[in-house]
């Protein structure tokens, strides 16, 4: 993604109060933090199956979208917004949780597979390509073995962060916002050099 190319920023998560603050909703949390920083509000947009806010004006405008379709159907909302605004897929960035990354780590990529994530799988299906940018936000994995991980995946991603974890999440989301500015100013590669090396203070497991 070239500097200034980003036009649609999508955070993945599940709608409803029961999912607020859960690990699976860290994409929503990032957009909420950005909206607060920019003093903008999300409004329901039925044609996009989600909540939308806008930052910037004119040719610098970026839409923020939180699909309200539940995670497994996130791609419907993304496709609807891409089509409505006449955007190209390379103007899209998706913010998504990732169990394969420790809590506190970030991975910015220009493309890639779903990696077992249902929201990304839906996006790839509806867009017809996996060549879109995504920022994976680590939430860590439960258990020490593959069997434990499989048994505890649902409770882990739908669970809320502990108080200690929330301190790390605050640092991570601050870094995400810095990274989004860098993507617009410097492009994906240079922003990735910083984001992919990020390590929050006080995180020995990172």
From Swiss-Prot:
Source domain of life: Bacteria
Site (Discriminates between blocked and unblocked aminoacyl-tRNA): 14
Keywords annotated in UniProt: Cytoplasm, Hydrolase, RNA-binding, tRNA-binding
Keyword Transmembrane helix: no
Annotated positions binding tRNA: 19, 70, 72, 118
Site (Stabilizes the basic form of H active site to accept a proton): 97
A molecular function (GO) term: tRNA binding
EC number: 3.1.1.29
Catalytic reaction list: an N-acyl-L-alpha-aminoacyl-tRNA + H2O = an N-acyl-L-amino acid + a tRNA + H(+)
Keyword tRNA-binding among record annotations: yes
Gene3D superfamilies assigned: Peptidyl-tRNA hydrolase
Broad class of enzyme this protein falls into: hydrolase
Transmembrane segments: none
GO cellular component: cytoplasm
InterPro entries: Pept_tRNA_hydro, Pept_tRNA_hydro_CS, Pept_tRNA_hydro_sf
Protein's cellular compartments: Cytoplasm
Any GO BP annotation: rescue of stalled ribosome
Family membership noted in the UniProt record: Belongs to the PTH family.
Subunit structure: Monomer.
NCBIfam families: pth
Functional description taken from the UniProt entry: Hydrolyzes ribosome-free peptidyl-tRNAs (with 1 or more amino acids incorporated), which drop off the ribosome during protein synthesis, or as a result of ribosome stalling. Catalyzes the release of premature peptidyl moieties from peptidyl-tRNA molecules trapped in stalled 50S ribosomal subunits, and thus maintains levels of free tRNAs and 50S ribosomes.
HAMAP family: Pept_tRNA_hydro_bact
Protein name: Peptidyl-tRNA hydrolase
Organism: Prochlorococcus marinus (strain MIT 9303)
């Amino acid at each position: 993604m070239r500097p200034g190319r980003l036009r649609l920023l999508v955070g993945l998560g599940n709608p409803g109060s029961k999912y607020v603050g859960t690990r699976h909703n860290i994409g929503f949390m990032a957009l909420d933090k950005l909206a607060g920083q920019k003093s903008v509000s999300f409004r329901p947009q039925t044609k996009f199956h989600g909540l939308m806010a806008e930052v910037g004006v004119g040719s610098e405008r970026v839409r923020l979208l939180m699909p309200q379709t539940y995670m497994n159907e996130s791609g419907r909302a993304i496709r609807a917004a891409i089509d409505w605004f006449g955007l190209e897929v390379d103007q899209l960035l998706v913010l998504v949780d990732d169990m394969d990354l420790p809590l506190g780590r970030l991975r910015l990529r220009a493309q890639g597979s779903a990696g077992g994530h249902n929201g990304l799988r839906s996006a790839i299906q509806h867009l017809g390509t996996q060549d879109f940018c995504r920022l994976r936000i680590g939430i860590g994995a439960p258990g020490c073995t593959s069997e434990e991980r499989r048994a505890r995946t649902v409770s882990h991603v739908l669970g809320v962060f502990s108080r200690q974890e929330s301190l790390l999440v605050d640092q991570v989301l601050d870094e995400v916002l810095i990274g989004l500015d860098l993507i617009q100013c410097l492009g994906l590669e240079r922003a990735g050099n910083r984001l992919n090396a990020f390590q929050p203070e006080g995180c020995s497991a990172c």
